[in-house]
Each structure stands twice: as C-alpha cells, then as structure tokens.
C-alpha cells in the first residue's frame, strides 16, 4: 500500500503527471477477464467473489470482508491514481509545503482522500469567486468612504452664535450694513470668528432685511390698491346718480318756454366773446338804473274862473 502511494507521488511530482500509479489487484476467484475489469468507484460495494490484494513490500496481503477499512482505503487510492482529471486545482495551497510533507512522511490514503475533497472544483470556484469578490467589495467600501468624505467636506455647517456674538453683530449692522475688509477682520477677531463667517452673516442679514422691506412695501401697495378701488366705486355711484338726475330734470322742464332744440339752462354754454358782450351789457344796464331821474316840467293848473268861462 505504501509502495503504491509513493510510486504515484514520485511520478506526479517528478514531472510526468500521467496519473499512473503502481498497484496490483488480483482476483482469486476470477481469471484474466476479471483482471481487466475497471476498478470499482468510491462508495460502491465490491463483488462478493472477488478479493482485493495489495503489495506492501514484503509480500501479498488479502483484505477480508471484515477488513472494511483497508478495502475503503484501496478503493480511494485507485480512484485518486486512475482518475486525476476529476480533481480540482487548489490555488490556496502552496506546492512547496505539500512536497515537504510528502518527503518527510508519505500520507496515508485517508489523508489523500481528504485533500481532494478539500480541493474539489466547487471549493476551487468558491475560493476564486471569493478572491475576485474581495477586491470589488474593498473598492466599493473605498468609494463609499470617499463619497462620505466628499459630501462631508462639501456640506456647510450652520454657524451657531452665542447671544453676545449675535448682539454685537446686530449693533454693528445697525451702524453699517456693509463692512470693508479692515472692519470685517477686526470684528472677526473680536468675536473669535473667521472673516468669511462674518461676511456670510452680513450677507444673510441684508437679504433678510430686504425681504422684510419688500413684504412691508407689498402690504402698503395692497392697502393703497384697496383704497383706490373703494374710491373708484364711490365715484361710479355718484356718476350714475348725476346721470339719473339730469334725465329726470330734462323730462320735467316745460317745452313751450324753450325750443325743441334749445337745451335746458343748466347745460347752456357760451363762447368767450359772447360771454364778454353779455357781461358788458349787464354792466351798462346796472349803471343806467343807478343814475338820478330827470325832473319832468309841469304847467300850473288854470284858475277855476277861466275853467268856468270856457265851460
């Protein structure tokens, strides 16, 4: 048994790697045709008429039906020797360590059986996929970390001011709503802030002030608009009343005093020249009425005798 394993190992690591091993199986009950039968697979029960024998260097030994452990080892060795293409390549195992172990002490068939199981194609594929997936996971983690750093660095933190700092800034803003670089630097040193923070605070404060002023102007304009709307409605009502009164007066005026085409006195208009002539005539009439009346000469009445004689 040991000779068979050593022979297989020597041929495998000697460069041939033909998958050939030194083994001897004799059939006691069978003939030459039985010897040409393929070796049994792992886990398959051997025929009851056949007995497997191995060479241990000193002579032949036969495995009885009770020696199940030896028969299992022999079948495992045959499987490993004659079917090397079913084994997978274990990329996680260094060949130097395997060579050292082989030269120091030849492994048994049970160890040889466990190693191919450990390095099966499934395990090889899983190990390869794990190795390929590890860099991608590491890359994803690094990208997430860089994104977090970028987002953290790009996001601005809100400035938290104390009551004293806010009061000083408000007083300064009431005096000057804008600051030159020297005033900005001095105020930043006084408040233990950065000049950029002071500048941003003043910008926000000016924006809030402008917004409040805009709201106030909007309210004022809204009130003015409402007032003008009410005044316009009142004027419309008065105009309607005057038109109704005019129509009523024109309907009640006597038509025999005025011609059909003569408008009523309330709507009579005169040109400037006629107006001057009318005013001059009125003035002359007033002056003549104010002058003293002339005395009218009268004759004395005749005596009564003359009147009687004539009669």
Curated annotation (Swiss-Prot):
Region (Leucine-zipper): 212-256
Matching CDD domains: homeodomain
Tissue specificity: Expressed in root provascular and vascular cylinder, provascular and vascular strands of leaves, provascular and vascular strands of the whole panicle, in mature embryo provascular bundles of scutellum and embryonic axis and provascular and vascular strands of young immature spikelet organs. Expressed in differentiating and differentiated xylem and phloem elements, and in outer and inner bundle sheath cells of all vascular bundles. Expressed in auricles, ligules, culm, guard cells brac hairs and pollen.
Compositionally skewed regions (Pro residues) per UniProt: 294-303
InterPro entries, per database record: HD, HD-ZIP_Homeobox_LZ_Class_II, HD-ZIP_N, Homeobox_CS, Homeodomain-like_sf, Leu_zip_homeo
DNA-binding region: 154-213
A UniProt-annotated Pfam family: HALZ
A single cellular component GO annotation: nucleus
Comp. bias (Low complexity): 119-145
Main location: nucleus
Record keyword Repressor present: yes
Biased composition (Polar residues): 280-289
Keyword Cell membrane: no
Region (Disordered): 29-69, 97-160, 279-311
Compartment annotation: Nucleus
PROSITE patterns tied to this protein: HOMEOBOX_1, HOMEOBOX_2
Molecular function via GO: DNA-binding transcription factor activity, RNA polymerase II-specific; sequence-specific DNA binding
Expression induction or repression: By auxin and sucrose in primary root apical region. By wounding in leaves.
Keywords per UniProt: DNA-binding, Homeobox, Nucleus, Repressor, Transcription, Transcription regulation
Segment forming the signal sequence: none
Physiological role: Probable transcription repressor involved leaf development. Binds to the DNA sequence 5'-CAAT[GC]ATTG-3'. May act as a regulatory switch to specify provascular cell fate.
Assembly information from the UniProt record: Homodimer. May form a heterodimer with HOX2, HOX3 or HOX7.
Family, similarity comment: Belongs to the HD-ZIP homeobox family. Class II subfamily.
Protein name: Homeobox-leucine zipper protein HOX1
Organism for this UniProt entry: Oryza sativa subsp. japonica
Higher taxonomy: Eukaryota, Viridiplantae, Streptophyta, Embryophyta, Tracheophyta
């Amino acid at each position: 048994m040991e000779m068979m394993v050593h022979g297989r190992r020597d041929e495998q690591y000697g460069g041939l790697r033909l998958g050939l091993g030194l083994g001897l199986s004799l059939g006691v009950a069978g003939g030459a045709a039985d010897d040409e039968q393929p070796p049994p697979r792992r886990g398959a029960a051997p025929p009851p008429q056949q007995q497997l024998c191995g060479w241990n260097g000193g002579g032949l030994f036969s495995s009885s039906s009770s020696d199940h452990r030896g028969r299992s080892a022999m079948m495992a060795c045959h499987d490993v020797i004659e079917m090397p293409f079913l084994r997978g390549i274990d990329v996680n195992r260094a060949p130097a360590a395997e060579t050292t172990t082989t030269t120091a002490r030849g492994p048994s068939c049970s160890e040889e059986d466990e190693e191919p199981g450990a390095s099966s194609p499934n395990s090889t594929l899983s190990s390869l996929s794990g190795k390929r997936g590890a860099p991608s996971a590491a890359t994803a983690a690094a990208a997430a970390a860089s994104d977090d750093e970028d987002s953290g660095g790009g996001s601005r933190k809100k400035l938290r001011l104390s009551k004293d700092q806010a009061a000083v800034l408000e007083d300064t803003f009431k005096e000057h709503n804008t600051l030159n670089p020297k005033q900005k630097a001095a105020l930043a040193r006084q408040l233990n802030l950065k000049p950029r923070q002071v500048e941003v605070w003043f910008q926000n404060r000016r924006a809030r002030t402008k917004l409040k002023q805009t709201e106030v102007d909007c309210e004022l304009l809204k009130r003015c608009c409402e007032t003008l709307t009410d005044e316009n409605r009142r004027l419309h009502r008065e105009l309607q009343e005057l038109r109704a009164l005019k129509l009523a007066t024109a309907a009640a005026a006597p038509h025999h005093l005025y011609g059909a085409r003569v408008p009523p006195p309330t709507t009579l208009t005169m040109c400037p020249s006629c107006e001057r002539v009318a005013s001059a005539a009125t003035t002359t009439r007033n002056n003549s009425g104010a002058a003293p009346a002339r005395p009218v000469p009268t004759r004395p009445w005749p005596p009564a005798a003359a009147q009687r004689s004539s009669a």
